[in-house]
Design a protein with these regions (language model features):
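Amphipathic alpha-helical
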Residues: 1-8
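Conserved N-terminal beta-strand and adjoining loop/helix that marks the start
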Residues: 8-38
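Conserved Nudix-box catalytic region and its N-terminal flanking loop in Nudix hydrolases
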Residues: 33, 37-81
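NUDIX/MutT-family hydrolases
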Residues: 106-146
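Generic C-terminal helix-cap and adjacent flexible tail
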Residues: 147-151
């Protein structure tokens, strides 16, 4: 074989060093209304994690604060205005093709009727109802922190 002929059979086959995974910061809003219900949305069927439920949010843009990101994403994707409050938790999660950091803040709904502008549907639910909806694995720690904060 070529490696033996070259005098170094342990050097072959040569592989490139693994490339670092892309990293993104995601701002997430856990939005409460006046009835202490939470807003969740269902991801579109096509694409990664299709059909699962999630807390709304999106990618942090360059030069943007996480609070601004959350407010912007909820306006763009759901058509609502919120007041972004305290940070609840930060969750790092790795997929096979990228690493994500979810920075999660508690939010208060201010105005706008939530619309599924970038999802299948949106729903207000009681915290104890969250267990009835399938969420991505990365959301388990968010739900745990949320329920723990509610006592």
């Amino acid at each position: 074989c070529a490696a033996y002929a070259a005098g170094d059979p342990t050097h072959w086959p040569m592989t490139d060093a693994p490339k670092p995974l892309p990293f993104q910061v995601i701002g997430v809003g856990v939005v409460f209304n006046a009835q202490d219900e939470l807003l969740i949305d269902q991801r579109l069927e096509e694409g990664l994690l299709g059909g699962l439920w999630e807390f709304p949010g999106g990618k942090l843009e360059e030069g943007e604060t996480i609070e601004t990101c959350i407010a912007r994403e909820l306006q763009e994707e759901l058509g609502i205005a919120v007041t972004v409050g305290a940070e609840l938790i930060t969750v790092d999660h790795a997929y096979s093709h990228k690493k994500l950091r979810f920075v999660v803040h508690l939010c208060t709904w201010v105005s706008g009727d939530p619309q599924p502008l970038a999802s299948q549907q949106v729903r207000w639910v009681r915290p104890e109802e969250l267990k009835n909806f399938p969420f991505p694995a990365a959301n388990a720690r968010i739900i745990e922190a949320l329920l723990g904060s509610l006592g």
